[in-house]
Amino acid sequence: MAKTLYEKLFDAHVVYEAQNETPLLYIDRHLVHEVTSPQAFDGLRAHGRPVRQPGKTFATMDHNVSTQTKDINASGEMARIQMQELIKNCKAFGVELYDLNHPYQGIVHVMGPEQGVTLPGMTIVCGDSHTATHGAFGALAFGIGTSEVEHVLATQTLKQGRAKTMKIEVKGTAAPGITAKDIVLAIIGKTGSAGGTGHVVEFCGEAIRNLSMEGRMTLCNMAIEMGAKAGLVAPDDTTFNYVKGRLHAPKGSDFDDAVAYWKTLKTDDGATFDTVVTLQAEDIAPQVTWGTNPGQVISVNDNIPDPASFADPVERASAEKALAYMGLKPGIPLTDVAIDKVFIGSCTNSRIEDLRAAAEIAKGRKVAPGVQALVVPGSGPVKAQAEAEGLDKIFIEAGFEWRLPGCSMCLAMNNDRLNPGERCASTSNRNFEGRQGRGGRTHLVSPAMAAAAAVTGHFADIRSIK
């Protein structure tokens, strides 16, 4: 029987399945951070259980960390406690930890791929909703809750029901300057923020194949923002070339054997999907969200929509509420909207390719008066590579702040946050009310678009910036 990539991955990991019971899946990799793990480790301790597979469990600090100092006390008491608990727990249970002083420390979804922890064909979980990022490698990756974190630590398995399947095909070639972030925002604009609910999404088509691994990670990272359980891209030579030589990747003949298997990880001809969505890449312009969910998105040269233009009463009410929160009036050009802060970073857009794109816009320009702009590399290795290429100097000379790795302003769990009423052009993944700080107003954009907003002081079309 012809199978989709998702069905192949799922079926290959079923440990036990009985009639009318949820299947039990084997988990190949478990990624851990400081926020969702303390209670899980406490549960193990209370029952006298070890971590079943410490060699398949990898931990880092990212959510709470300060991006201005490596001092564990810098982000407040709760953050300090969570980070100290992670240090204690990893030591007690034999789990490898990339702490604040480790050169590999960084955002968990940046660290995993760059260390070769993430490999095609795997099941990967983490107590974090954006675990979908790792699906870019043709791995079945999804976020789990703290009680499930404990279950995986104890058993290396997880009960998981089968999801519906969705194919999103992006046909043709994207125009110059159009990034994976623009593509995924355009997709969510079409599906809505709940269009993928109950599904695992496979992204395919020429425009997807043309993306780098960094771009594919951006794409799969935001699959969750359309309500999907996970996102997938079938592995190919781009994947294999990225993985080869990384710390935890197979070596020598083992790598060749792995690639032979990885090449089978694709949807069979004749396999059917429950839902199919198609977009034309050439129709996609630079995207900017205007509302309070990622599906409320328009092209940069569009006007802020009028809620009255939405036929669906729920969408209309949502638009009215969003515009009130965002402090925007219908009909005004998006390019007239001024910004206060810019955040370039997060598990969506903090990799070297993202920083290069932003630096290209920043080079030879200055951050607009009154704008604070942060650039936060996703990991120690990304930071080191950017500095080796001189990107830090470009940013600093332009007036951007060059920070230490961490989740930073993506979420208000550390010192980097918006004040009430402040408007931010952000390369992160969520523009919910209060996501970047109470009363903060978030607009999601690509790294180049964020840099353009920083130097102009408002949203600007990168295609018109020479």
UniProtKB/Swiss-Prot annotation:
Q: Which cofactor does it need?
A: [4Fe-4S] cluster
Enzyme class, one word? lyase
Under catalytic activity, the entry for this protein gives: (2R,3S)-3-isopropylmalate = (2S)-2-isopropylmalate
Could you tell me the superkingdom of the organism this chain comes from?
A: Bacteria
Query: Is rRNA processing tagged as a keyword?
Result: no
Q: Which UniProt keywords apply?
A: 4Fe-4S, Amino-acid biosynthesis, Branched-chain amino acid biosynthesis, Iron, Iron-sulfur, Leucine biosynthesis, Lyase, Metal-binding
Q: Which Pfam families match?
A: Aconitase
Which one of the record's GO molecular function terms can you name? metal ion binding
Q: What is this protein called?
A: 3-isopropylmalate dehydratase large subunit
Record organism: Citrobacter koseri (strain ATCC BAA-895 / CDC 4225-83 / SGSC4696)
In the UniProt record, what gene is named as encoding this protein? leuC
